């Protein structure tokens, strides 16, 4: 008697199909770094299970669905939704974080039914995070697909003609310096540039994309991009994390760091405590003052960075919210290290932040 196993709300099991290939076990242990799937019993009594039959605590857990060769592990939200040959397949890029994982979006009529990974060895390899895979679940919930206009203190449905006419009327009634605009975190470059051109047309400079104040020198592009490639992490021989938790902020980036740690034994250091990252690291300090010590060669890490051939320093967006964050980009010590300056990598939370820095702060 083969019983179905509980693996959480994302993974549906049908263990009568299982051939004990242990692909899911190896993925959980080697790639995800969360060894929660394993085999118990011997011979004909062998079973694949999560031991305590609880939900997998991994942000990459649903990749076992793609790995399973026989359909013993399938997507629970997608079950009985559609047949593969009924779906229109569109290649796209993930916008749930700033990594840019390559994905395939499967749609039935106008509904997004599922999101699958596309192979790209330079970015996400063949994996995607659970956030990426199941972000489509909320696309049809409370969706704003028509404009609303406030009338008598209540928002009422309108149409685009009425909304645009009202907008033009309001713009004409006020001075340009009284008009402000804000752009979202998931806007694409074409629309962002169009929005800026609109404000240039009405002669207003009150355009913003940041919800919080960032202390950052945006005059040079290298200060707000991830300078080395994602796969370049594998060639690094020292990694320093400053104010970032890559496991939750950028799951695929964290998977690359883990790969470098497991395969190349790369030493990893952190300023701040990011929590469980699925690999070992050493916390140098939990204060940004440590950056000043590194610059002045007063830290144990200074010589290690200078002597490393391919060091990488990954800076989290949260650091830029601190007033001391602006000094990170003035670190002359890092500029002397080979290769010059581009060892500093800024990871921004949202996909549109880099676009917005390039367009609005120039």
Residue ranges with predicted function:
Residues 2-3, 8-13, 84-86:
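Membrane-interfacial loop-to-helix junctions in multi-pass inner-membrane proteins
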Residues 1-7, 42, 139-149:
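Residues forming anionic-ligand binding surfaces in small-molecule and nucleic-acid pockets
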Residues 14-15, 21, 25-26, 32, ...:
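Catalytic alpha/large subunits of respiratory electron-transfer oxidoreductases
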Residues 1-5, 35-49, 214-216:
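Short, conserved phosphate-binding/catalytic loop or strand-edge motifs used
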Residues 7, 18-21, 30, 35-39:
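Hydrophobic alpha-helical bundles that form the membrane domains of multi-pass transporters
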Residues 37, 73-74:
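Short hydrophobic beta-strand motif reused across regulatory alpha/beta modules
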Residues 339-340:
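Cationic, amphipathic, low-complexity segments that mediate targeting or membrane/lipid association
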């Amino acid at each position: 008697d083969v019983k179905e196993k509980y693996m959480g709300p994302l993974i549906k099991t049908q263990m009568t199909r299982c051939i004990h290939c242990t692909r899911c076990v190896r993925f959980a242990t080697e790639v995800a770094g969360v060894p929660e799937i394993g085999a118990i019993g011997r011979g004909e009594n062998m079973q694949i299970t999560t031991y305590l039959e609880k939900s997998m605590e991994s942000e990459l857990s649903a990749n076992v669905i793609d790995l399973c060769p026989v359909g013993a592990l399938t997507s629970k939200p997608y079950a009985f939704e559609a047949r593969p040959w009924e779906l229109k397949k569109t290649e796209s890029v993930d916008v749930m974080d700033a990594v840019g994982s390559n994905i395939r979006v499967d749609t039935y009529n106008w509904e997004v039914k599922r999101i699958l990974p596309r192979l790209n060895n330079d970015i996400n390899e063949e994996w995607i995070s659970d956030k990426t895979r199941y972000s489509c679940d909320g696309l049809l919930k409370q969706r704003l697909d028509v404009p609303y206009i406030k009338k008598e203190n209540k928002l009422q449905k309108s149409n685009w003609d009425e909304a645009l006419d009202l907008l033009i009327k309001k713009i004409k009634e006020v001075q340009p310096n009284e008009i402000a605009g804000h752009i979202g975190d998931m806007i694409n470059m074409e629309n962002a540039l169009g929005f800026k051109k609109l404000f240039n047309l009405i002669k207003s400079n009150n355009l913003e994309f940041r919800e919080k104040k960032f202390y950052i020198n945006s005059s040079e592009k290298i200060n707000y991009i991830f300078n080395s490639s994602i796969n370049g992490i594998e060639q690094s021989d020292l990694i320093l994390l400053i104010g970032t938790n890559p496991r939750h902020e950028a799951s695929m980036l964290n998977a690359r760091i883990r790969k470098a740690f497991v395969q190349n034994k790369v030493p990893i250091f952190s300023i701040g405590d990011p929590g469980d990252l699925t690999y070992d690291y050493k916390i140098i300090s939990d204060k940004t003052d440590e950056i000043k010590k590194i610059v002045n060669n007063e830290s144990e890490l200074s010589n290690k960075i200078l002597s490393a051939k391919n060091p990488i320093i990954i800076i989290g967006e949260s650091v830029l919210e601190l007033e001391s964050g602006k000094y990170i980009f003035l670190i002359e010590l890092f500029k002397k290290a080979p290769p010059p300056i581009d060892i500093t990598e800024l990871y921004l939370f949202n996909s549109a932040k880099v676009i917005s820095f390039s367009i609005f702060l120039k």
